């Protein structure tokens, strides 16, 4: 018992054997139970702070889901501690806000890379280092989304630390910087904005892990500003199913490659 307590990860309260090699990472602890319901033989493992963990199987392979909370700091903690006890393949699934005018509410965005407009990743790699998703996972996510018939956008997402820095930039003392950079993201064709992928991609590279991300588009403030059709879409079940189906593809690929 004493040894088990010593080995327990500080934040996620898990020990080696509690989680699988493959982990889905939502932000919201409240989504973990419904994600675990898509596994076989799922059971609850632990919950502490923003971290809610379930483990089950997919295609006979041990898999887990662990929520990360909001933003890079808590997401990086989850990845670090999960990696400490054996995880090496991660899929972030969650929500985003569209930026590119072609990205509409209810669509799926698969991130190929992320703008490091956050600071967690700075403690892992210099700013010149890109935050890039694992190619195999990215391809699997896109394949899974298209197989579901979802309108799918693949490209770069923007990651920030301050939610209201995006949504209320004019009131911020550094509004001049926020607004100018937002205009740059638009002109560069950035697909959407969210808060975790840049940190997760860089941390995964530092740990020699694999990570990809897919998102459900809730809203696109740029479409609203342009007077285009726009509605709120809060049902994230499609993005969750995309992540689970993609994980099955990765498991099959790993078996074929004997990874």
Task: Enumerate the predicted regions with their spans.
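Metabolite-binding pocket within alpha/beta catalytic cores that recognizes anionic/polar moieties
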Residues: 2-140
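Glycine-rich beta-alpha junction loops
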Residues: 29, 97, 158-164, 199, ...
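Flexible, glycine/charged-enriched surface loops at secondary-structure junctions
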Residues: 42-47, 149-156, 252-259
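Short acidic/polar active-site loop segments enriched in Thr and Asp
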Residues: 88-89, 191, 210
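Active-site rim beta-loop-alpha module in soluble metabolic enzymes
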Residues: 131-189
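Generic non-transmembrane alpha-helical segments
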Residues: 140-148, 203, 242-253
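Zn-dependent metallopeptidase/amidohydrolase metal-coordination segment
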Residues: 198-232
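His/Asp/Glu-rich mid-to-C-terminal helical/loop segments that flank catalytic regions of hydrolases
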Residues: 221-259
